[in-house]
């Protein structure tokens, strides 16, 4: 088994800290800021930092306000002295955000760079509801169907652009007060140049990796390149409903060996008996171990579980 023969370091993500009310003073910087990409004439000097929304992976996400329009945004700032891996992830995320324009993908309003200090900032729409991570166990099937439809439309859009997300999980799905859900965090995503490109590398969050991404040789290296996103999506849907990570008993903390065995050798998790037949079937279509039999995003959008939510 590929992953057993060559154990890779897991890409673990730290949870974002609680939203802070700490205010920032607005001081001018001696380093010149260059607008790499933007819209609506927004520049970095137009923005006032309000508080920290979160930090991790070498960067800080601020809640900011436009000084003239009072519009609220999220500003992700990364310093130039970060690890080269994070630098590549940032470049990849910037490239994908430049290419995408969908109501189901977080919108980029501008990219600013301070060449002298090597600082890069990405201005994105502000999602005031946080992430889906906070909703685990408190989501009804009806509400889950509404979320699923939006996420699948986002995945269908990305896959049509030959973009594989590779880290679909509750923490990377943003929510606003209108119950709109948008896909975010493209640091480990991949743009496929050729149809035969492989994307089964060990990146992202291992808990949500599909069987073929743990062991690419199990499918002879010919697995559906987009199917890993669907597996992650299916696990996430089940997790939001039952309130805990579905591959392990409630309260058990996952480790590499346990996860690998559960994903590669265990049976896929199923929805509880009390769930509707439509939802149970929906989850089963997402969590088929054979990636060639796993449903695609467009196919899942036509599933009876979502047709009930018109």
From Swiss-Prot:
Gene3D superfamilies in the record: Phosphorylase Kinase, domain 1, Transferase(Phosphotransferase) domain 1
GO molecular function, one term: protein kinase activator activity
Alphabetical list of InterPro entries matching this protein: Kinase-like_dom_sf, Prot_kinase_dom, Protein_kinase_ATP_BS, Ser/Thr_kinase_AS
Posttranslational modification: Phosphorylation at Ser-195 and Ser-201 by MAP kinase kinase kinases positively regulates kinase activity. Autophosphorylated.
GO BP of this protein: camalexin biosynthetic process; cellular response to hypoxia; ethylene biosynthetic process; ethylene-activated signaling pathway; leaf senescence; pollen-pistil interaction; positive regulation of DNA-templated transcription; protein autophosphorylation
CDD domains given in the database record: PKc_MAPKK_plant_like
Keywords: ATP-binding, Cytoplasm, Ethylene biosynthesis, Kinase, Nucleotide-binding, Nucleus, Phosphoprotein, Serine/threonine-protein kinase, Stress response, Transferase
Family: Belongs to the protein kinase superfamily. STE Ser/Thr protein kinase family. MAP kinase kinase subfamily.
Name listed for the protein in its UniProt record: Mitogen-activated protein kinase kinase 9
Native species: Arabidopsis thaliana (Mouse-ear cress)
Lineage: Eukaryota, Viridiplantae, Streptophyta, Embryophyta, Tracheophyta
């Amino acid at each position: 088994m590929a992953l057993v023969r060559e154990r890779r370091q897991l890409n673990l993500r730290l949870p974002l800290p609680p939203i802070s009310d700490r205010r920032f003073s607005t001081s001018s910087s001696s380093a010149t800021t260059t607008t790499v990409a933007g819209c609506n004439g927004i520049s970095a000097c137009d923005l006032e930092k309000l508080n920290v929304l979160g930090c991790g992976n070498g960067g800080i996400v601020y809640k900011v306000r436009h000084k003239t329009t009072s519009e609220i945004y999220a500003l992700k700032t990364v310093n130039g002295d970060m690890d080269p891996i994070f630098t590549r992830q940032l470049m990849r995320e910037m490239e994908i955000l430049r290419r995408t324009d969908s109501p189901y993908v977080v919108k980029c309003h501008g990219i600013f760079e301070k060449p002298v200090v090597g600082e890069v900032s990405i201005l994105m729409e502000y999602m005031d509801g946080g992430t889906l991570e906070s909703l685990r166990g408190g989501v009804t099937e009806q509400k889950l169907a509404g979320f699923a439809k939006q996420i699948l439309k986002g995945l269908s859009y990305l896959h049509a652009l030959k973009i594989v997300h590779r880290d679909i999980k509750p923490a990377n799905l943003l929510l606003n007060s209108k119950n709109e859900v948008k896909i975010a965090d493209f640091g480990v995503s991949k743009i496929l140049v050729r149809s035969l490109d492989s994307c089964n590398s060990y990146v992202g969050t291992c808990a949500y990796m599909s069987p073929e991404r743990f062991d690419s040789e199990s499918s002879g290296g010919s697995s559906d390149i987009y199917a890993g996103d669907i597996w992650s999506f299916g696990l996430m849907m089940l997790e939001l409903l039952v309130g805990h990570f579905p591959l392990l008993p409630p309260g058990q903390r996952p480790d590499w060996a346990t996860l690998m065995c559960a994903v590669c050798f265990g049976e896929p998790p199923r929805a509880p008996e009390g769930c509707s037949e439509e939802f149970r079937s929906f989850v089963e279509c997402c969590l088929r171990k054979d990636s060639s039999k796993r449903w695609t995003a467009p196919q899942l959008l036509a599933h009876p579980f979502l047709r009930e939510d018109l």
